[in-house]
Amino acid sequence: MNTFGQQTSNPHAQDLLDMAKYYDHFNHYHQQQNQQLPQRPAAPPAPGYGLNEFSPPTANPYLWLNGPAINSSPYLNGGSGSPYFPTGYGGGQRQFLPPSSGFGVADFPWLSIPNQADLLKMVRPPYSYSSLIAMSIQNTPDKKLTLSQIYNYVAENFPFYKKSKAGWQNSIRHNLSLNDCFKKVARDDNDPGKGNYWTLDPNCEKMFDNGNFRRKRKRKSEIVGAGFDEESNEDKKPLALKSLGPDSPGGASVVLEQSSYTAPEGKNKSPVGSVARDSSHCFTNFASNMNALINGRAPRQFSAGHGDFSNSRHYLAELASCPISSPPISEAQTKVACYPSKQQNSLCTSVLNPFSLNHVYSREGEV
C-alpha cells in the first residue's frame, strides 16, 4: 500500500507511463494501416542517355581564331583532341582567320566577296579630296584635266566613289575653287570641248603636308582706294605731343607740333587742317598765359591740406574764351614748351589737364 501510494503521489512518473502507453498504441495502429494498403508496382528505371547517342551536327557552330580543328574526345572513344566536345564536332569545323600570308576568298568565308575589288567598294580610301584632285592631274601627260575628267579618274581608280556621286563631286568642286594650288586654265581656240582645264600651281609642293594638301582659301581682292601707306596714315594726325627726354636741352618738356597733312589727289581736302590750326592757336594762347603765370607766381600756399582750385578755374575760363577760328600761324609759333624746371612734371601735367589739382605736398617734403 505504501509503495502504491508513493507511485501515485509522484505526478512525473505518472506522465511517463501515460506517454509510453500512447506511443505503443500509435505504433500498433500504424502497422495495421500499412498492412491494409495494396502494394503498388515499382516504376521502371529511367533509361540512360550517353553522348554518343546524339546525332552529330552538320558543322561546328563555333568560329575559332587561328585554332586547329576539333577531333573526337579521348574520354569517349579514346582518340586525341579536346576532352570537352563529343565525337562529330570536328568533321565540319569552320576556321576563322587561319594563319595565311595572302588575301583570298578562303580567308573570309563569312563574307560573300568574290575578289578584292568588291572589298574596296566598301572601304573609303584614306585620301582627302585635294589629294585625289592632285593625283588625277599628276597622272596625266598634259598635267591638266577638266572637271568631268577628274570625276572619271576618281570613280575609275577608287570604286568607293562610284556610288552617291552627288556628294563627293560637290566636294571636288568646292576644293578646286578654294584651294590655291589648283589653277584654272582657259581652253585654246583650236581645242574644242566644254569647260576649263585645271592644273597644279608650280609652288604647290609647299602646300603639301603629310600626303594631304592643306586647305587654303583664296585671298580676297584688295579693297578699292586702300592705297595709303603707313607714312600717310601718320600724317593724318595734325597735332602731336612729343615728350623730350631729360638729357635734351631745356630739360623734360612737352612740345606741341603741327604735322602737315596732304590730301590725296583727286579728293577734296579735309577741313581737319583748319580746325587743327584753330586748336593749336588756342592752345598756344593758353600755354603762353601759363608761362606768364609760372614766371611771376608766388610760392604755393596750402590751406587745410586741400588743393587750390582757383588757378584751374582761371585756366578753364581762358580755354573757353579761345576763338574757334583764327588766322593761320607759322610753324615756329606752334612749338611751345612748358616751363623747364625741376618741377616740370607737375607743371606739364597741369598744362595738359586743367582739371588736375595742385600737389598737397611739395617734392622737397614741405608741408
Curated annotation (Swiss-Prot):
<keyword id="KW-0804">Transcription</keyword>
<dbReference type="GO" id="GO:0000981">
    <property type="term" value="F:DNA-binding transcription factor activity, RNA polymerase II-specific"/>
</dbReference>
<dbReference type="InterPro" id="IPR036388">
    <property type="entry name" value="WH-like_DNA-bd_sf"/>
</dbReference>
<dbReference type="InterPro" id="IPR036390">
    <property type="entry name" value="WH_DNA-bd_sf"/>
</dbReference>
<dbReference type="InterPro" id="IPR030456">
    <property type="entry name" value="TF_fork_head_CS_2"/>
</dbReference>
<dbReference type="GO" id="GO:0009653">
    <property type="term" value="P:anatomical structure morphogenesis"/>
</dbReference>
<feature type="DNA-binding region" description="Fork-head">
    <location>
        <begin position="124"/>
        <end position="218"/>
    </location>
</feature>
<feature type="region of interest" description="Disordered">
    <location>
        <begin position="224"/>
        <end position="254"/>
    </location>
</feature>
<dbReference type="InterPro" id="IPR001766">
    <property type="entry name" value="Fork_head_dom"/>
</dbReference>
<dbReference type="GO" id="GO:0030154">
    <property type="term" value="P:cell differentiation"/>
</dbReference>
<dbReference type="GO" id="GO:0006357">
    <property type="term" value="P:regulation of transcription by RNA polymerase II"/>
</dbReference>
<dbReference type="InterPro" id="IPR050211">
    <property type="entry name" value="FOX_domain-containing"/>
</dbReference>
<dbReference type="Pfam" id="PF00250">
    <property type="entry name" value="Forkhead"/>
</dbReference>
<keyword id="KW-0010">Activator</keyword>
<dbReference type="GO" id="GO:0005634">
    <property type="term" value="C:nucleus"/>
</dbReference>
<keyword id="KW-0805">Transcription regulation</keyword>
<feature type="region of interest" description="Disordered">
    <location>
        <begin position="31"/>
        <end position="51"/>
    </location>
</feature>
<feature type="compositionally biased region" description="Low complexity">
    <location>
        <begin position="31"/>
        <end position="40"/>
    </location>
</feature>
<comment type="function">
    <text>Possible transcriptional activator.</text>
</comment>
<protein>
    <recommendedName>
        <fullName>Forkhead box protein I2-B</fullName>
    </recommendedName>
</protein>
<keyword id="KW-0539">Nucleus</keyword>
<dbReference type="GO" id="GO:0000978">
    <property type="term" value="F:RNA polymerase II cis-regulatory region sequence-specific DNA binding"/>
</dbReference>
<keyword id="KW-0238">DNA-binding</keyword>
